[in-house]
């Protein structure tokens, strides 16, 4: 993956840098908002790539990263970038699903076959539908560049007992990493709760909550694997990170000659990151997390039970998203046939 990325960047260098040496004006600095902490694999990747962006554009564009929610929190990302608080940023779309139901699509349990189906769907129509959903909701300054993912999410790591099937969630108070996760915990028979992720470790350690859902990056970067003892090794779905840009910032700050090359570079980085993140996800899952938690891997029948528990959430989502949701689900099903 690293060789592929470097090769692609070299091609971009030949196609983009040489013409850009004739572009007049000084360097443009754009603000990129990320809510993940500095040690998160997501932040590390883009921090390493930004000097390449500057080099490829002949020093004409600099992108400064504001990580750890220093510029925008996760719940503020979409609206904040639309307002121009940041020029560029990574949104976790389901965070906005309460006000824009369509954005909850990626967190729906049981609809994704695998990472290929996920990526193929977004590369063949879903990305454009997300931009349409933003537009319909009044966030008209947002341009969607592309979508990467932060790996698989899991329904329960806890301190109390081994969980094998959804019914075993009964009696457990579980923090959900997002609105849909909370609803899925409820649908499985547990009690889904909202706790700020920065408070999650202490809440589990003190017994305020029994555990959490999460991505492998949550368990490792936030160390949530440490107070938890049991982990159900079934992934209902994948998590998205969407790169969005403020259109007005692009037009106002970036010279016309640089806009398309910049978008091409950012699109490439997003797609290349998919492989980088999944490698990190696999390392966390296979090597790091088992040192702290006892895994239970559901059998085929038990996996069906976990998928069935999420069916009502899929139906509810479809009922709230109308024609746009129907069109999106058709794309999902086309590229995720089992």
Feature annotation, model-predicted:
Residues 17-18, 129, 270-272:
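A short hydrophobic/aromatic micro-motif that marks alpha-helical segments and, especially, helix-coil
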Residues 120-133:
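Signature of the catalytic double-stranded beta-helix
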Residues 15-16, 44, 127:
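Residues in and immediately flanking transmembrane alpha helices
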Residues 1-29, 338:
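Short, low-complexity disordered leader/linker segments with a strong preference
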Residues 23-118, 134-338:
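N-terminal secretory/targeting leader peptides
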């Amino acid at each position: 993956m690293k060789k592929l990325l470097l090769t692609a960047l070299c091609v971009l260098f030949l196609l983009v840098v040489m013409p850009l040496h004739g572009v007049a004006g000084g360097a443009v600095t754009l603000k990129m908002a990320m809510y993940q902490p500095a040690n998160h694999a997501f932040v590390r990747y883009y921090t390493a790539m930004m000097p390449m962006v500057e080099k490829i554009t002949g020093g004409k564009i600099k992108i400064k990263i504001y990580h750890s929610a220093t510029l925008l929190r996760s719940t503020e990302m979409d609206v904040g970038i639309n307002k121009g608080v940041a020029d560029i940023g990574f949104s976790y779309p389901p965070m906005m699903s309460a006000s824009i139901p369509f954005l909850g699509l990626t967190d729906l349990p049981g609809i994704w076959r695998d990472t290929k189906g996920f990526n193929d769907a977004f590369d063949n129509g879903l990305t454009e539908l997300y931009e349409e959903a933003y537009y319909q909701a009044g966030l008209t300054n947002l341009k969607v560049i592309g979508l990467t993912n932060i790996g698989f999410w899991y329904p329960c790591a806890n301190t109390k007992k081994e969980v094998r099937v959804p019914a075993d969630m009964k009696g457990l108070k579980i923090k959900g990493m997002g609105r849909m996760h909370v609803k899925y915990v409820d649908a499985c028979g547990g009690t889904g709760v909202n706790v700020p992720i920065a408070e999650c470790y202490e809440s589990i350690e003190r017994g305020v909550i029994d555990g959490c859902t999460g991505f492998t990056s949550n368990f490792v970067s936030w160390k949530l694997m440490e107070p938890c003892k049991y982990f159900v090794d079934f992934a209902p779905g994948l998590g998205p990170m969407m790169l969005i840009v403020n259109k007005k910032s692009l037009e106002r700050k970036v010279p016309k000659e640089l806009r398309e090359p910049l978008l091409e570079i950012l699109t490439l980085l997003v797609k290349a990151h998919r492989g980088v993140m999944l490698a990190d996800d696999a390392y966390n899952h296979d090597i790091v997390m088992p040192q702290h938690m006892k895994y239970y891997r559901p059998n085929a029948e038990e996996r069906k039970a976990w998928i069935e528990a999420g069916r009502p959430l899929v139906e509810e989502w479809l009922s709230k998203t109308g024609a746009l949701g129907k069109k999106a689900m058709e794309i999902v099903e086309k590229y995720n046939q089992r």
